Amino acid sequence: MSNGPITRTVRQALILDLLEQNQVSSQMQLSELLKQRGVDITQGTLSRDLDELGAKKIRPNGGRAFYAVGTSEDAASSTTAGTREKLRKMLDDLLVSVDHSGNIAVLRTPPAGAPFLASFIDRVGMDEVVGTIAGDDTVFVLARDPMTGKELGEFLSQRRTSL
């Protein structure tokens, strides 16, 4: 993680990543995992982030409870408008510039922002996107035929402001 301050969107994307990779059973445990990644966070901010992300404690088959986001019940009840709004916020916070080559849109982000933006684009499941590859500050987004990389880049730039 970079040494400078991070945006709320990047912090929340990191929280999502940690919740996907670990069975986090408490806010204290999540706070420690964030600290290991260089993010110091207050309990109040962490609690708000978890609430905004829709993280809920689940206890599968009566086992140990842990935080999860996007369970099958949540996915069934989530609205397209909410997903579009989250994508707009992510693009507003992270998209610095757009370029293209062939059927690839090249998205530039601040340092450490690309993995979070790519992961979210993949999770949204846009029909226009085949998949993403992310470095530290660059995301390659592969456009689905017949769309070109230029058209996809323009589409994402427009979503940034029009949603």
From Swiss-Prot:
Listed GO CC annotations: cytoplasm
Domain of life the protein comes from: Bacteria
Matching InterPro entries: Arg_repress, Arg_repress_C, Arg_repress_C_sf, Arg_repress_DNA-bd, WH-like_DNA-bd_sf, WH_DNA-bd_sf
Keywords in alphabetical order: Amino-acid biosynthesis, Arginine biosynthesis, Cytoplasm, DNA-binding, Repressor, Transcription, Transcription regulation
The keyword Repressor belongs to this UniProt entry's keyword annotation: yes
GO BP annotations listed: L-arginine biosynthetic process; protein complex oligomerization; regulation of arginine biosynthetic process
Gene3D superfamilies the record matches: 3.30.1360.40, Winged helix-like DNA-binding domain superfamily/Winged helix DNA-binding domain
Pathway recorded for this protein: Amino-acid biosynthesis; L-arginine biosynthesis [regulation]
Database matches in SUPFAM superfamilies: C-terminal domain of arginine repressor, Winged helix' DNA-binding domain
Role: Regulates arginine biosynthesis genes.
Protein name: Arginine repressor
Taxonomic lineage of the native organism: Bacteria, Bacillati, Actinomycetota, Actinomycetes, Mycobacteriales
